[in-house]
């Protein structure tokens, strides 16, 4: 915790506190004398006094933010959206393909579907649209959507049943808007969802959109497609896509039109045009400040991150631990990057040098190779027959490209195997790659690649004759390296110029014997902070808004459950409560259930947590140690021991927060909460389910899980 930091509470914050009943006027009047300059103090006293007199009249009108039932809107883009190109009435049936994507997979499927559909149906015009680019506001969504007659939606579900950043505005308008009756009666549609069956809210966004479209008059062409990334989502997409063609044949092809009906479609392998440069040429240099970072702009998003230095890095585990957890602080002073307690930070880390050198060897190229990528021909006409993502900033060296932009450690998709097969000079290797990518090789792919967690580099090493050119490697084989998201473990009330991250090192063996090192966690562990060197580490970062917030009424009870690095957002919560307490706010009770293996090894932030207890911002610290006693003890066991207290806090309007592993811990905690409600509330199982659902709908049961 940053000691001695000033509390960032504005005069309007203080006046609002009176209006919202979180503090009395007398405490705030005394506080203003010590926190506000003489020039503003008298004005604030007048404002505070007036507010106190009016509080009885306006309290019922004060709007209180609901922390759940709203989807946080992503930051506005830096650049104004392009004006939509006017549609030309060429007599063709208009088909719109929408996508909501977080990592690019949904966008890739949308483009692959549209490319094949274009080849099949020459009398139709296909548009591929990012849902965020489709409309500037709710009115435009309403105006344009009601005119769509044939549309397909590719929608990923992210986090705890949330829409992706670029689908957040659309989903908020679509799912939370007023009942519009048969609003979509003109539309025929199909929906394909991308999710992971291990998560509770599997494909929630696609399910909601599919159901609401049908309820509001749209005609479903094919059943909802449920892509499962826990298995082979490409196979799910292929199976769903094959259901569509017979339906589109009836809609988009005349009876006498047999062109393309029986033709076999072969997708083109995406390939950038590559220009190589003499690295000795003084005109071609890598410019560190010209690689897409948005430093200096008023707002940022994950497509426009800002470059932030690492200010502090320290190990949180003791030397007795065989694992590692890093506390890292990004310096955001002067960048104009702001965050709220409970938000997430997206971090673009680099591949470690060992991984990069392995890739250079497999590609057979010098790390000093300077090149640029292009999506057009030399004459400026677009490359046809492919769906290339925008190229990363170039010219750059091969080493830079592999370190910053290429995902080298994930398992390769089947489309990547097809591309590798096309450039394998050894026939047996090409045949094996083609088999793994084929429907008949489905089981072999699932076992040899997915179950064994083989990375792209491992697969390339198994097929050494496959030497794809750089345009194919970056266009069709190596996906773009994605940002890693972390729950911010600080509060801007205490650390306004720092974003704190709490990150456990990913270092584990795979079935093949390879040691998998997490890209971002390894980078953080090895980062050089400003406090050690002026030549410190830095990374592009951005803030993603979250609904994981403390209640607006600070007097309400708070229950926090977060083992391991799940503690991160609660550290920010407790910093926030400390700032509010120092400002005179009335705080309700707060209980933290934390879990780790052993007090002497991995009890992270132990001293800070004890200080929060002593300061009165944490009422009870309850720790489960899973490796100390004869039996393993976890947070859900401690919850059972405190069942009466938990039920009393919930009954008093308390909020329940859970952060951590979605597949294990969060499920166990969810079951424990059901048991507590059933036993302490004397409810049957059906009423328990309804009660917990209502807590979620009211924003009083929130989860930040991964």
Curated annotation (Swiss-Prot):
Primary localization: endoplasmic reticulum
Cofactors that this protein relies on: FAD; FMN
GO biological process per UniProt: piperine biosynthetic process
Annotated cofactor note: Binds 1 FAD per monomer.
Catalytic reaction list: 2 oxidized [cytochrome P450] + NADPH = 2 reduced [cytochrome P450] + NADP(+) + H(+)
UniProt keyword annotations, A-Z: Endoplasmic reticulum, FAD, Flavoprotein, FMN, Membrane, NADP, Oxidoreductase, Transmembrane, Transmembrane helix
Record keyword Endoplasmic reticulum present: yes
Topology of this chain in the membrane: Single-pass membrane protein
Positions annotated to bind FAD: 484-487, 502-504, 518-521, 706
Subcellular location: Endoplasmic reticulum membrane
GO cellular component: cytosol; endoplasmic reticulum membrane
Keyword match Membrane: yes
EC number from the UniProt entry: 1.6.2.4
Family affiliation: Belongs to the NADPH--cytochrome P450 reductase family. In the N-terminal section; belongs to the flavodoxin family.
Name the record gives this protein: NADPH--cytochrome P450 reductase
Organism: Piper nigrum
Designated gene of the protein: CPR
């Amino acid at each position: 915790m940053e000691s001695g930091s000033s509390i960032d509470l504005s005069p309007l914050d203080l006046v609002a506190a009176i209006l919202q009943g979180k503090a009395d006027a007398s405490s705030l009047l005394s506080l203003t004398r010590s926190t506000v300059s003489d020039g503003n103090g008298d004005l604030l006293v007048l404002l505070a006094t007036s507010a106190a007199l009016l509080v009885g009249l306006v309290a019922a009108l004060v709007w209180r933010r609901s922390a759940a039932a709203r989807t946080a809107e992503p930051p506005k883009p830096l650049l104004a959206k392009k004006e939509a190109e006017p549609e030309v009435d060429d007599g063709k049936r208009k088909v719109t393909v929408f996508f909501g994507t977080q990592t690019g997979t949904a966008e890739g499927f949308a483009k692959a579907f549209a490319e094949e559909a274009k080849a099949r149906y020459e009398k139709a015009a296909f548009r591929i649209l990012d849902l965020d680019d489709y409309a500037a506001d709710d009115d435009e969504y309403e105006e344009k959507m009601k005119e769509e007659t044939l549309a397909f939606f590719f929608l990923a579900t992210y986090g705890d049943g949330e829409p992706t950043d670029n689908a957040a505005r659309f989903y908020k308008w679509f799912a939370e808007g007023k009942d519009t009756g048969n609003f979509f009666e003109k539309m025929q549609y199909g929906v394909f969802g991308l999710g992971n069956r291990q998560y509770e809210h599997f494909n929630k966004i696609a399910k909601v959109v599919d159901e609401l479209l049908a309820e509001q008059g749209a005609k479903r062409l094919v059943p909802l497609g449920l892509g499962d990334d826990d298995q082979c989502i490409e196979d799910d997409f292929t199976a769903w896509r094959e259901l569509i063609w017979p339906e589109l044949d009836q809609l988009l092809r005349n009876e006498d039109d047999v062109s393309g009906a029986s033709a076999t479609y072969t997708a083109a392998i995406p390939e950038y045009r590559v220009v190589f440069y003499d690295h000795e040429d003084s005109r071609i240099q890598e410019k560190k400040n010209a690689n897409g970072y948005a430093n200096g702009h008023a707002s940022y998003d994950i497509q426009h991150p800002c470059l932030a230095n690492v200010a502090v890095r320290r190990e949180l585990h003791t030397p007795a631990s065989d694992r590692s957890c890093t506390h890292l602080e990004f310096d955001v002073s002067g960048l104009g990057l702001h965050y709220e307690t409970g938000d997430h930070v997206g971090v673009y880390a680099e591949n470690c040098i060992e991984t990069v050198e392995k890739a250079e060897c497999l590609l057979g190229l010098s790390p000093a190779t300077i090149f640029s990528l292009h999506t057009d021909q030399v004459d400026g006409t677009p490359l046809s027959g492919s769906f290339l993502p925008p190229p990363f900033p170039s010219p750059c060296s091969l080493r830079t490209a592999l370190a910053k932009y290429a995902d080298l450690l994930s398992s390769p998709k089947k489309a990547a195997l097809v591309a590798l097969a096309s450039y394998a000079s050894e026939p047996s290797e090409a045949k094996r790659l083609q088999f793994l990518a084929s429907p008949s090789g489905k089981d072999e792919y699932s076992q040899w690649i997915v179950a064994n967690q083989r990375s792209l580099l491992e697969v390339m090493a198994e097929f050494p004759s496959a030497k794809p050119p750089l345009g194919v490697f970056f266009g069709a084989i190596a996906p773009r390296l994605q940002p890693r998201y972390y729950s911010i473990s600080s509060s801007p009330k205490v650390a306004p110029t720092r974003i704190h991250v709490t990150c456990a090192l990913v270092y584990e063996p795979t079935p093949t014997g390879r040691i998998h090192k997490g890209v971002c966690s390894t980078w953080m562990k090895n980062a050089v902070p400003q406090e050690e060197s002026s030549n410190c580490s830095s990374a592009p970062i951005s803030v993603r808004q979250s609904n994981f917030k403390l209640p607006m009424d600070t007097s309400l009870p708070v229950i926090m459950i977060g083992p391991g690095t799940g503690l991160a957002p609660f550290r920010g919560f407790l910093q926030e409560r400390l700032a509010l307490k120092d400002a005179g706010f009335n705080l309700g009770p707060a209980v933290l259930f934390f879990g780790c293996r052993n007090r002497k090894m991995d009890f992270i932030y132990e001293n800070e947590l004890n200080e929060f207890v002593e300061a009165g911002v944490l009422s009870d610290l309850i720790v489960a140690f899973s490796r100390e006693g004869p039996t393993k003890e976890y947070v859900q066991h401690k919850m059972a021991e405190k069942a009466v207290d938990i039920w009393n806090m919930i009954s008093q309007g308390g909020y329940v927060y859970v952060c951590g592993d979605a597949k294990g811990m969060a499920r166990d905690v969810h079951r424990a909460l059901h048991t507590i409600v059933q036993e302490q509330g004397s409810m049957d199982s059906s009423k328990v389910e309804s009660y917990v659902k209502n807590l979620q709908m009211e924003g009083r049961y929130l989860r930040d899980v991964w």
